[in-house]
C-alpha cells in the first residue's frame, strides 16, 4: 500500500484532564485514492491529518509512506518530505495579499523540483482570466481555488485537505469539491480530506469514520 496508518493513538492533557482523541487508528490508502476522514468536531480528524503531514506526533503507532516511517525521519528529512510530497488545503485560504493570483500559485511551484505548469493549473481551476487580480478582488470560492492551485502546482503525491469548504456557502462548496475531485482524477493525486459533512462521502473511494 502507499500510505499505512498503523495503530495511531494520541492524547492531550494529563491526569484527570487527559483526553484520548485517537484510539488506535488503522487505515491503508492506495496511490490515487480519495479518502475522507469523517466525524464530528473533536473526533480527532484534524489531529490525524496533522500526524500524517508530520506536523504533530502520535503517542504510539506509526505512519508509513511508500514503506518509509515518518517517525524515523529527522527534522531535515521531515521538512523535505513535506516540501516534496505533500500539499495542504485549509479552511482559510492564507493567500499573500500583495501578490496576484498567478504569483500566489507560483509560490507553490518554487517549493517543487518537478512543478506542474502554472498556467495549466489556472485554466483547470477557472482562474486564468483572473490571474492578474489580487486576492481581495476575488470571491471566497475563487480564493479557495487559488489555494488549491498553490497546493497542487508543486505536483504533490498527497493532498491533505482540512475542511476546505468550511468557510464557503453550499453552492460554492460543491464547486470546490468538484475541483478537488478533478485534481484527484487528472493528476492521480492521493487525497485525504477531513470533513464533518456526510454528503462528501459519496465522492470518496474510501471513508473512515472517526
Place the predicted regions along the sequence by residue.
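ABC ATPase NBD coupling module
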Residues: 17, 70-87
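Helix-to-loop junction immediately C-terminal to a conserved catalytic motif
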Residues: 53
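Conserved ABC transporter NBD signature motif
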Residues: 61-69
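Short coil-to-helix segment of the ABC ATPase nucleotide-binding domain corresponding to the Q-loop/switch region
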Residues: 99-106
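Conserved ABC ATPase signature
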Residues: 134-144
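A short, proline-enriched helix->beta-strand linker immediately N-terminal to the Walker B motif
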Residues: 153-157
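Catalytic Walker B motif of ABC-type/P-loop ATPase nucleotide-binding domains
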Residues: 159-162
